[in-house]
Amino acid sequence: MAFLKLTEQNVRGKTVLIRADMNVPFKGGKISDDTRIRASLASVKYCLDNGASVIVMTHLGRPTEGEFHPEDDVAPVAAHLGGLLGKDVKVLNDWRENKPALNAGDVVMLQNVRINKGEKKNDLELGKAYAALCDVFVNDAFGTAHRAQASTEAVAQAAPVACAGVLMAGELDALGKALKQPARPMVAIVAGSKVSTKLTILESLADKVDQLIVGGGIANTFLLAEGKAIGKSLAEHDLVEESKKIMAKMAAKGGSVPLPTDVVVAKAFAADAEAVVKDIADVAEDEMILDIGPKSAAALAELLKAAGTVVWNGPVGVFEFDQFAGGTKALAEAIAQSKAFSIAGGGDTLAAIAKFGVTEQIGYISTGGGAFLEFLEGKELPAVAALEKTRRVNGLI
């Protein structure tokens, strides 16, 4: 991937428009988690430290285009950002009619981009209106990179200079390192409730990795493909043949899809359900598999410790219930102890990493849910493609 980076730009005396992802959750009318705001601080501070004025734009919630309601207002986000920066961050509601006059060191925020008509349809005129505000456009919203919208793609095409922010560049560099030029052996963990939601990821990674670990309902479907009885466990019988093809593809290249030989089962999916460890051959008809067993976890942990690159998407058990968390904990700790370059993404994965206290030991934690998954699938991310295109158009590569 070839794109300009904010940290390569001379922004002194310029106005920089940063598309951030500050779509934070609220509880009781207050921001309950400011992780996404903090994630883009590096880009904002780079601009301020180098003599620029900054305009931040973000989406918040899912408003109806052309309509404004109090819950759509980014004012609380602007106030929180201002608190972190030690500055007053004003919200601009009429920025199309009144272009802001800014001085170096100023920071302002546009009103919620998703109330603008044409935002979701990637309207070029709206993109031009955004671009007219700035000398340099910065996309720092990896979480929305898989969407072609006016504030991510059209603006990049219209801006004098379009580049990746510190967060965006970090995401793309880490993903590129993990998937484009991985240290071997490369191991991927893909887990979740359904093969159908991650089939394209499994197929794409099967071409790249040396070992493909599956977990959750996905593993159950693969166990069915191996002819194993899984009781009343969650599985997709109609995708057994697809699972067989993926296992055959891995075997043909000398790799494998290592499936559990022992599992943790229960008769009900509940926080107080009794957990029983069994060999896979002993799973009864009235039992469901809710985690991998200790022998399987130990074997997979050895694979991870010996890996050169690890890509992790999804917990291998119902880790929210402590009695079914052992497998995911063992793998998390193995990744933390491994010398491999590791990258992890997806909401449940991040929750597991936090629960087991290994955040600092993971090489890179992706902030993008859908964008992370689509990158794993090998899909083009529209917002990233726009940055690459503008670099080519400007004759820079």
Curated annotation (Swiss-Prot):
Keywords: ATP-binding, Cytoplasm, Glycolysis, Kinase, Nucleotide-binding, Transferase
Recorded GO MF terms: ADP binding; ATP binding; phosphoglycerate kinase activity
Presence of the UniProt keyword Nucleotide-binding in the record: yes
EC number annotated for this UniProt entry: 2.7.2.3
GO cellular component, one term: cytosol
InterPro entries: Phosphoglycerate_kinase, Phosphoglycerate_kinase_CS, Phosphoglycerate_kinase_N, Phosphoglycerate_kinase_sf
Record GO biological process: gluconeogenesis; glycolytic process
Protein's pathway: Carbohydrate degradation; glycolysis; pyruvate from D-glyceraldehyde 3-phosphate: step 2/5
Entry-linked PROSITE patterns: PGLYCERATE_KINASE
Amino-acid positions noted as binding substrate in the UniProt annotation, renumbered to this chain: D21, M22, N23, R36, H59, L60, G61, R62, R114, R147
Subcellular location per the Swiss-Prot or TrEMBL entry: Cytoplasm
Reaction it catalyzes: (2R)-3-phosphoglycerate + ATP = (2R)-3-phospho-glyceroyl phosphate + ADP
Family as reported in the entry's similarity comment: Belongs to the phosphoglycerate kinase family.
HAMAP family found in the cross-reference section: Phosphoglyc_kinase
Name the record gives this protein: Phosphoglycerate kinase
Annotated source species: Neisseria gonorrhoeae (strain NCCP11945)
Lineage: Bacteria, Pseudomonadati, Pseudomonadota, Betaproteobacteria, Neisseriales
